[in-house]
UniProtKB/Swiss-Prot annotation:
Family: Belongs to the DapB family.
Protein name: 4-hydroxy-tetrahydrodipicolinate reductase
Lineage, opening ranks: Archaea, Methanobacteriati, Methanobacteriota, Methanomada group, Methanococci
Organism field: Methanococcus maripaludis (strain C7 / ATCC BAA-1331)
CC per GO annotation: cytoplasm
Residue positions of the active site: H160, K164
PROSITE patterns, per database record: DAPB (PS01298)
EC number: 1.17.1.8
Subcellular location: Cytoplasm
Pathway entry: Amino-acid biosynthesis; L-lysine biosynthesis via DAP pathway; (S)-tetrahydrodipicolinate from L-aspartate: step 4/4
C-alpha cells in the first residue's frame, strides 16, 4: 500500500485526487494538507470532500515536516501554486518523500531550486504541466508536426477558466518548448500582439491566452502556410482526466529510487 500525502487538499485538483485515491487499490491517503490557518483544519478530509469519514484530518502547510514524518508518507502530490510548491518539494525531498508535481507558473529560478533539492536528496519526482493522457499524445504529435511542417507559421491558442492565476498556461509553454526543440530553424516565443507590430516574422511562435467561464483547459496549435491551415487541438472537459493521469504518476514514481521524470516517462512515450 503506497502512502500518499496531498497538498492543496481542498482545491479542485487536490480534492479530486483524494477521492480517486480512496477508490484505487494499492493507494492510501495518509495526509491532507492545505494553507496555514485554514478554518477547516482538524476536520476529516473525507467529510470535507463528500466521501464520508476516512480517518484523515485536514492539516496545514506550516506543519508540513511534522505531518510527513508522522504519517509516513511515501509520495507527496502537489497541485498548488509555484512559491509554496517549491517550499513543499524541498521539505518532502529532505525527508526522502517522492513527489508528483502538477503545479505550474514556476520561474526558471524556482524550477531550478526545486529540481536541485530533488536531485541533492536523491528522491524521485514526476513534474508535468498536464497529466491528462490525451494531452501527452497531443505533445507527441506536435513533435512530428514541427519536424514536418517547420516552414509553416505557428501560433498557439489556450483558454482556461476565469480563476486561473498564471498565463500562459504551463501546457501552452510546454507545447511551445516541444515545437522549438523539433524545428530545424531559429524560433522565438512571443506573447500576444498589440499595436503596430509590423509583419509577422518566420521565427515567431506566438502564444495567445484567453480566460473565461469554467473552461478546464483548451489548447490549439495552428500551422499555417499559403493555401492551407492545420490545427491540432486538445480539450479537457473534466478534471478527472487530469486526476487519472496524476494517479498513474503516483503509481509510477512510488517505487523509483531517484530521478526527475515527466509524463512521457509515465506513459512510456519516450
Amino acid at each position: 500500500m503506497v502512502k500518499v500525502a496531498v497538498t492543496g487538499a481542498l482545491g479542485r485538483m487536490g480534492s479530486g485526487i483524494i477521492k480517486t485515491i480512496t477508490e484505487t487499490d494499492g493507494l492510501d491517503v495518509v495526509a491532507a494538507i492545505d494553507i496555514p490557518n485554514h478554518p477547516k483544519k482538524g476536520q476529516d478530509i473525507g467529510e470535507l470532500t463528500g466521501l464520508g469519514k476516512i480517518g484523515v484530518s485536514l492539516s496545514t502547510s506550516d506543519e508540513l515536516e511534522a505531518i510527513l514524518k508522522e504519517s509516513g508518507a511515501e509520495v507527496l502530490v502537489d497541485f498548488t501554486a509555484a512559491a509554496p510548491c517549491v517550499n513543499t518539494a524541498k521539505t518532502a525531498a529532505k525527508l526522502g518523500v517522492n513527489l508528483v508535481i502538477g503545479t505550474t507558473g514556476f520561474t526558471p529560478e524556482q524550477r531550478a531550486e526545486m529540481e536541485n533539492a530533488i536531485s541533492e536528496n536523491k528522491v524521485a519526482a514526476t513534474i508535468s504541466q498536464n497529466y491528462a493522457v490525451g494531452v501527452n499524445i497531443f505533445f507527441k504529435t506536435l513533435e512530428l508536426l514541427a519536424q514536418k511542417l517547420g516552414d509553416y507559421d505557428i501560433e498557439i491558442l489556450e483558454m482556461h477558466h476565469k480563476f486561473k492565476k498564471d498565463a500562459p498556461s504551463g501546457t501552452a509553454l510546454r507545447a511551445a518548448e516541444i515545437i522549438q526543440n523539433n524545428l530545424n530553424r531559429d524560433s522565438n516565443i512571443i506573447y500576444g500582439r498589440e499595436g503596430i507590430t509590423g509583419e509577422r516574422t518566420k521565427e515567431e511562435i506566438c502564444i495567445h491566452a484567453l480566460r473565461g467561464g469554467d473552461i478546464v483547459g483548451d489548447h490549439t496549435v495552428i500551422f499555417t502556410t499559403d493555401g492551407e491551415r492545420l490545427e491540432l487541438s486538445h480539450r479537457v472537459t473534466s478534471r478527472q482526466s487530469l486526476v487519472s493521469g496524476a494517479i498513474r504518476a503516483i503509481q509510477f514514481v512510488a517505487d523509483k529510487k531517484e530521478g526527475i521524470y515527466n509524463t512521457f516517462d509515465v506513459l512510456d512515450l519516450n
